[in-house]
Amino acid sequence: MINTLDRYKDVYDIKNMSLDELNLLSRELRNFIIESVSQNGGHLASNLGVVELTLSLYNVFDFSYDKLIWDVGHQCYVHKILTGRRSGFQNLRKINGLSGFPKRCESKFDHFETGHSSTSISSALGMARARDLKGENYNVVAVIGDGALTGGMALEALNDVGDNKTKLTIILNDNQMSIGKNVGGLSTYLSSLRIDPNYNKFKRDVEGIIKKIPNIGKGVAKNLERVKDGVKQVLVPGMLFENMGIKYFGPIDGHNIKQLSKVMDKAKNMKEPVIIHVVTTKGKGYKFAEQNPDKFHGIGSFDYMTGCSKKSKGVTYSKAFGKAMVSIASKDKRVVAITAAMKDGTGLNEFSNKFKNRIFDVGIAEQHAVTMAAGMATAGLRPVFSVYSTFLQRAYDQVLHDVCIQNLPVVFAIDRAGLVGEDGETHQGVFDMSYLSHMPNMTIMAPKCVEELEFMLNWALSQESPIAIRYPKGESRLNLKPIKNFQKGKWEVLEDKGKISIIATGRMVEKAFNVKETLKERNIDIGLINATFVKPIDKEMLNKIIDEEKTIITLEDNVILGGFGNSVLNYVRDTNSNIKVVNLGFKDEFIPHGKVDDLFKMYGLDEEAILKEVMKLM
């Protein structure tokens, strides 16, 4: 028997399906997504939560001309399947395969590319205003989660939307179940009255009857209005949006296609901004994801039947950072941790359990996090802001203006520095060296191995200025002794031989070390330096290399432009030396999705390519 998903041809089929067929399609879509992600990895829980929501959107709107923007974008799998990309899921997030996020080059139905949170309302408003200025007629819909709504950019956009009354539909996908049972039931009841077209007529009729009561009628009606407004302010969460000038519907059951379609159809025909508050269950339909949605947010391949993923044997940098924070904080009460909704991802769970009053999760608010850290530093604390490289760039101005200008002792623990792999352009952490290097007072460090990270963090917290420590996703297989005592701007010599010296940073030291060992087996010697400090560079060591007239190869997992290699090259040029400097890093382009090892090979930064580069310079 052919199932509904196999019979499905294009988005117009959805409008011709019965409610039973749509519900059956929902179940089949979930099964397909679970099976696909179990094989290739990806974002599971968020996608399972928006199946009915996505079907309802396509049931009501026509996104061949209407516009749909997914905030963050990791919940777009159903959308991609419905728009003809089901076959691409066998290569999901692989090089040249289907992206895990909206991509305009993939489909005419991907109207805007996303990856970071809180951007959808702004981009949707831009499209809506362009529509109005050009005299066109289409709907614009933004889907944003309750977590992303904590981002300042989303709130700025809401303020603008409500002020100018531009026609726009915002779907607030609330998957945190933040509405309690009693309040939730009452809120749903009140919402159903507000959605019902007879509600306003009923309200007018009651007010009319009361006003006809001799002597006291008008006064009672006014007081009734005040009471009604007071009750709504207390009990109806949507009053926040109503007061901003945005019509509110909800909360709605995000897994009820009939109810969702009804409300969306009403919003579609309104001439003002509308927000539809839907409540969904993250991981819906797969018990392991429902029970542990955080684990199944972004996950590698796993066993479909048990939900168990392949366990990593080694210690990741994130885990090492978390353990180091616990160890250091137990000895120094000034140390506090800050995270922007990434407590689990950055390894701070144990810290959170042991020091509940010394960890601050500010939500998706990196700008606020950095300036709050600056305030803490001025008051005598030692704040550590743990953040992914790609998200720190959202707080560039705060790092420069609020931390560096005042030369404050804030430590930036930059996780996922360098390649992160399958999440692609929006998440690769290959810019932090460049945008931090030109900030006065900033020191940048990179451990060569997991063990070195704790000693580096200890040293950073003893300094009186801003320090950034960058480290990659995953583990280190480098079996070398860590540096335990650091001297600012001093590098570590791992091998001082030959006429070529590789100066490598962070995880790239492991690749350089393996290349050195391969050459050693061929009786070829080269030098190897662990550039523990990306900034300041070790000028004394560089002067020694210049005096010995060695060729320098710099190796970094950052874009070359403005990066570590550029700093070395500029210094050598300033000395008027003629020695050759070769910078190996990423080109001036955005790096696509794919496995980390495949991407290193693609950009000529795998061990084989580095070895060839060394041999060319012999």
Curated annotation (Swiss-Prot):
Native source organism of the sequence: Clostridium tetani (strain Massachusetts / E88)
Cofactors (names): Mg(2+); thiamine diphosphate
Residues bound to Mg(2+): 146, 175
Gene it is expressed from: dxs
Residues the entry annotates as binding thiamine diphosphate: 74, 115-117, 147-148, 175, 286, 366
Name used for this protein in its record: 1-deoxy-D-xylulose-5-phosphate synthase
Biological processes per GO annotation: 1-deoxy-D-xylulose 5-phosphate biosynthetic process; isopentenyl diphosphate biosynthetic process, methylerythritol 4-phosphate pathway; terpenoid biosynthetic process; thiamine biosynthetic process
Domain of life: Bacteria
Annotated EC: 2.2.1.7
Catalyzed chemical reaction(s): D-glyceraldehyde 3-phosphate + pyruvate + H(+) = 1-deoxy-D-xylulose 5-phosphate + CO2
EC category name: transferase
